[in-house]
Amino acid sequence: MKNQFVLLLLAIVFLQMIFQSDAILSAIWSGIKSLFGKRGLENMDKFDELFDGDLSEADLDFLKELMR
């Protein structure tokens, strides 16, 4: 009974490793494809202005209005 339980645990661990490595490899492959794809070599600096980490006074006022 103990041997069966140990074999079951090992099988679960190995299957989990296989599925997780498959997900990681597919994510890496899609990243490589996007780098060398048609749009992958474009200049992506235009997206740097989309995120502004600082909150201005007007932003804080707007958030206060939303929370009322």
Swiss-Prot record:
Keyword Aminoacyl-tRNA synthetase: no
Function: Antimicrobial peptide that inhibits the growth of Gram-positive (S.aureus, MIC=10 uM) and Gram-negative bacteria (E.coli, MIC=15 uM and P.aeruginosa, MIC=6 uM). It also shows 35% of hemolysis when 15 uM are tested (95% at 50 uM).
Tissue expression: Expressed by the venom gland.
Principal place of residence: secreted
Keywords: Amidation, Antibiotic, Antimicrobial, Cleavage on pair of basic residues, Cytolysis, Hemolysis, Membrane, Secreted, Signal, Target cell membrane, Target membrane, Transmembrane
Disulfide bonds: none
Modification after translation: The non-amidated UyCT3 does not show antimicrobial activity.
Name of the protein this chain belongs to: Antimicrobial peptide UyCT3
Proregion positions: 40-68
Compartmental location: Secreted; Target cell membrane
Chain positions with Phenylalanine amide modification: 36
One GO cellular component, as annotated: extracellular region
The keyword Membrane is assigned to this record: yes
Family: Belongs to the non-disulfide-bridged peptide (NDBP) superfamily. Short antimicrobial peptide (group 4) family.
Gene Ontology terms describing biological process: defense response to bacterium; killing of cells of another organism
Signal sequence, start to end: 1-23
